Amino acid sequence: MTNEYLAPFVDELFNLGVREAVFSPGSRSTALAMLFEEYKKYDTYVNIDERSAAFFALGIAKAKKRPVVLVCTSGSAAAHHFPAVLEAKMSRVPLIILTADRPAELQFVGAPQTVDQTRFFGNFVNHFENLEAPHIQKQSQTENFWTYPRKVAQRAVLSAISPLSGPVQINVPLRDLLVPELKSENYEKGRSKHAFKFYEGQAQVILPFDEALLSGKTLILAGANFDKDYSEALLKLAEQLKAPILADPLSNLRNHNHPLVIDSYDAFLANNDLKTQLKADAILLFGQMPVSKRLQQFVAFNNEAEFIQVDPALDYRNPSLTTTTMVQSDVLPFASSIKKVNSDSSYLEKWQNAQEKMRQLLEKVTYEESPFEGRYVQELQKHLEALDAQLLVSNSMEIRDIDYWWKKADAKVRILGNRGVNGIDGTESTALGIATTGKPTVLLTGDLSMLHDLNGLIVGKTHELNLTIVLFNNDGGGIFHHLAQKGVPNFDYLFSTPHGLNFAGLAELTGLDYHLVSGYADFGQQFEASLHQSGIHLLEIKTDKDLSLALHQKYTTYEN
């Protein structure tokens, strides 16, 4: 399967309207040239000089006003494309340049016809991407071998024509054997049930969705967003469609005790029988994909659904590789364009019933006496939901604790997080930046995140900012107890990383008001007091990683 994955790439480009391919002869680009030619539907052209070939392709694209593929071998060949790439960029002509390349193991070792082709054309392309051979570890990943190259093709075409037309470079590292197996059936592999579509602007957003939305099995995924208009628009849309909204905690839709808002889904989507019952015909994604890994797995499992991503920037935000339609629109105009439909309510009821059953189990944690993050999150919500406050949640385990235990309720508190790249760095600094608004501000963080940004506390003292820090201290990386690394050799040393540091001493060093929480009642008293006092307050809650894992499993196992 050395280069068979390129056949779906060739097929997808054609499906998206590409009709011409221009080649210059070369060994490393053999598979690309042969697969385009064997497809039989492209108008193909061969030009022995890469510079001339590039301008020839430019002329086709300029005249026909659509993307044209330009293929070259590795080494200096791409350099001869540069003048035409510059012209395409400045005159906004769509070109898709496929630069064949040597694989990683032949880079920087003196292999012939090998230069660093990463971002070869610099800022003069709209988009750059490597099309690597997909790696398959197990049978369940075979589908991605054929789906992934189609997604690269979709991004290439989309970037070549939107928002402004221009050139795109797709670098294609290829290993021997370079001559492909020409199997006609490979072109069809990885095709979605729904042809990929994208819509620029806001005028046509309703057109591709009527049939799927009318089926009644429509699911809305609400990713991170902190605007009030976002929540109101999605609630309006859900009411029109009678569709459940799976609300990420950072969507702030859990501030609405609305029957269409679904929480606790990360827990019950672990049940395979229920997952099958909840499969949708259409999935609408707003914002980035929610934090729940089980939800992402559900989306991949639900790969025959029409997956519609609504985003003003047309950014790909679906790591499950199942997006079938992209709509360039903000939430409000999209929601306003959808007309009220008569849909079957049974699909919605399945989600509501699953949530209710899960809620009954999760609420039993209120009787838990052991120090457990789940109950402390519920206690935190109880004290915050009536306030016009701001809660920043650190990454790693804390955002997942919020995802599990923060239930929907009519509230004002805004939940924020740094989910762009999901790092644990800069947490205290971000919280103090948020605190400059003057509203009551709380940071929920873990011990490693806290240690990562101790220097950030200095600005809070300098500028006399007010912040309450709720610290879950399990002496290391507790998230790894929930992941595949649990139990591997040297687990504590490599992953759990117990540090044994004294946060009382660190608080004294940084000038924080410190309190070691002795129980749930004590937490409530100290937390309320901190909100009415100036300065930075640190409430440390000590937990045990193994006990937390056991309690998490106890309270989140959904059974039929």
Curated annotation (Swiss-Prot):
It is an enzyme of class 2 (transferase). InterPro entries: DHS-like_NAD/FAD-binding_dom (IPR029035), MenaQ_synth_MenD (IPR004433), MenD_middle (IPR032264), THDP-binding (IPR029061), Thiamin_PyroP_enz_TPP-bd_dom (IPR012001), TPP_enzyme_TPP-bd (IPR011766). The keyword Iron does not apply. SUPFAM superfamilies: DHS-like NAD/FAD-binding domain (SSF52467), Thiamin diphosphate-binding fold (THDP-binding) (SSF52518). Binds 1 thiamine pyrophosphate per subunit. Transmembrane segments: none annotated. The keyword Metal-binding applies. Catalyzes the thiamine diphosphate-dependent decarboxylation of 2-oxoglutarate and the subsequent addition of the resulting succinic semialdehyde-thiamine pyrophosphate anion to isochorismate to yield 2-succinyl-5-enolpyruvyl-6-hydroxy-3-cyclohexene-1-carboxylate (SEPHCHC). HAMAP family: MenD. This is 2-succinyl-5-enolpyruvyl-6-hydroxy-3-cyclohexene-1-carboxylate synthase. It comes from Lactococcus lactis subsp. lactis (strain IL1403). The gene is menD.
